[in-house]
């Protein structure tokens, strides 16, 4: 495992203010007002945070008068807080006990509006923001708050809000120990990639382990695509494992990712022999050299 890949980069920051009223709406505006976003402020035991969410959900079901009735969507519209619009989903793959409470649009249950944490509702777009100016570029996922950001980017923003393209592959929630990096730009999480480490288990059903580091999932938010972020993440992945003779990218590779690979390998020809499209666990019978495949497909297209 590369030493720098999993280094601790930012400590968790405790909120100095008193806890908000259960079920309230959090709108944090950054350092200029002394406030922090969720990833900057979230600390404490995840089990306690989940217990808070379960308590809140129970009060919501009972229609307790102690919790707010509506959630204000950024832009002014209000959504009534009721049981039919709120549900739990697993935070991690293969771990149903750790759950996140989500609020959906009553007009479209596939649209998630907010996440419940720290005794308040956080609009989805606020969850992926930071007020910490040092949180910039690619940063390893370490804290529980960063795990939440990864979940929102992967499961909600990609899986529900921006995942309609036929070229995209559906991303399941990651495991609790998934090796991943989030790309931060201008105070916002705009992309991420995750890696299956060499020697890690392929899944919980077998004893097979990955035979090489594998770039497993890559996602860039739509408004930040075509700006070179895919190239930057692929380069960072390769630079994180300079001692490895072979690196994998999980099969199947999307058409958009193939374009990134082609441009990357043209720019860095020294990596052409190292990058392989692989199926787990990645032995030689499960590998196809990506550069060779690109050349063969280009040659085939030229003969048509």
Describe every region a protein language model picked out.
Residues 1-212, 238-304:
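Terminal substrate-recognition subdomain of acyl/acetyltransferases
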Residues 217-239:
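Conserved acetyl-CoA-binding loop-helix of GNAT-fold acetyltransferases
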């Amino acid at each position: 495992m590369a030493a720098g890949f999993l280094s601790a980069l930012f400590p968790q920051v405790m909120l100095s203010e008193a806890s908000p009223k259960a079920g309230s709406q959090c709108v944090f505006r950054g350092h200029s007002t002394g406030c922090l976003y969720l990833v900057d402020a979230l600390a404490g035991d995840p089990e306690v945070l989940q217990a808070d969410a379960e308590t809140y959900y129970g009060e919501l079901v009972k229609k307790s008068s102690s919790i707010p009735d509506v959630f204000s969507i950024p832009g002014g519209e209000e959504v009534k807080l009721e049981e039919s619009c709120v549900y739990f989903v697993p935070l991690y793959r293969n771990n149903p006990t750790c759950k996140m409470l989500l609020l959906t649009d009553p007009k479209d249950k596939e649209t998630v509006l907010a996440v419940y944490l720290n005794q308040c509702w956080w609009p989805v777009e606020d969850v992926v923001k930071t007020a910490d100016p040092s949180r910039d570029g690619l940063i390893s996922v370490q804290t529980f708050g960063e795990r939440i950001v990864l979940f929102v980017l992967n499961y909600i923003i990609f899986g529900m809000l921006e995942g309609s393209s036929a070229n995209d592959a559906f991303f399941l929630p990651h495991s609790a120990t998934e090796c991943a990096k989030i790309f931060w730009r201008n105070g916002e999480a705009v992309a991420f990639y995750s890696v299956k480490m060499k020697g890690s288990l392929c899944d919980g059903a077998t004893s097979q382990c990955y035979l090489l580091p594998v770039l497993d999932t890559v996602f860039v938010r739509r408004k930040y695509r075509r700006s070179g972020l895919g190239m930057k993440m692929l380069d960072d992945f390769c630079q994180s494992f300079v001692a490895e003779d072979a690196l994998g990218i999980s099969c199947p590779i999307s058409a958009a990712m193939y374009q990134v690979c082609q441009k990357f390998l043209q720019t860095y020809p020294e990596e052409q022999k190292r990058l392989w499209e692989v199926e787990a666990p990645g032995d030689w019978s499960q590998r196809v050299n990506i550069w060779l495949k690109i050349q063969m497909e280009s040659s085939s297209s030229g003969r048509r």
